[in-house]
From Swiss-Prot:
The gene is arnD. This is Probable 4-deoxy-4-formamido-L-arabinose-phosphoundecaprenol deformylase ArnD. InterPro entries: ArnD, Glyco_hydro/deAcase_b/a-brl, NODB_dom, Polysacc_deacetylase_ArnD. GO terms for cellular component: membrane. Gene3D superfamilies: Glycoside hydrolase/deacetylase (3.20.20.370). It comes from Yersinia enterocolitica serotype O:8 / biotype 1B (strain NCTC 13174 / 8081).
Amino acid sequence: MKQVGLRIDVDTYRGTKEGVPSLLAVLEKHDISASFFFSVGPDNMGRHLWRLFRPRFLWKMLRSNAASLYGWDILLAGTAWPGKQIAKDFGPLMKATLQAGHEVGLHAWDHQGWQAKVATWSEQQLTEQVQLGIDALQHSIQQPVTCSAAAGWRADERVLAVKQLFSFSYNSDCRGTHPFRPLLPDGSIGSVQIPVTLPTYDEVVGSEVRTEDFNNFIINAISHDNGVPVYTIHAEVEGMSQALMFDQLLVMAKERGIQFCALGSLLPKNLDSLPVGKVVRAAFPGREGWLGCQSALEDA
């Protein structure tokens, strides 16, 4: 069986409320463990609408048919009213996710705020954002938070240095090909990074592939991934509007000898055996703006 890390990003209030229970049910049906990364503070995702003035973001929203994919309540959340507090209302669901045998980690305190402002936040502001998220998630699951995944893959050396203060066992903050140990600005080695290696639904549908062909597309991408494959889905997509498609993907994967697993399962016992690399800002296909991307030391 080919192991593929399954990362589930939970970005919004409705995605937590509706998408997570749906995903828990389908994962139990197929006997799969995954890694859930929760946004836990205010749902302000509607504030992304100003980005429609940026051509790449507008094109992404149009080709993915965002209104149908996500729903207007998600697209407008936190615009004309304060964003709902996610962990405050769904802490028990986050704990139930952990009790169901899945990894549970921090995605963000304020997902929209992180994506929009992380590049300009001071070290103190970055630390406060991570601390707020950890406090809320830890209160919800009643256990230490041991892993994290930066919202929108918006992470660079500054972010990694701040996260090092919180002693995560691993982070999944970037796009890349295989797990590695990141070099930090002070020359030390940070907590292991497990990059996402495969495209997400919204990155390729409407440009590279039609919705009805997506499962075959991603199965083929997994088959040709020669690194350590990691696939990201979203509670707001595969747990809601594309739930049936995701269920069918899990059936196809099993038939082709693909076993999805939690990200922590991909790591070797000896973490020192992993190569050292860097996380750098770079443009990424299907995404607007910069993302954190894995880079070899000699390329950075």
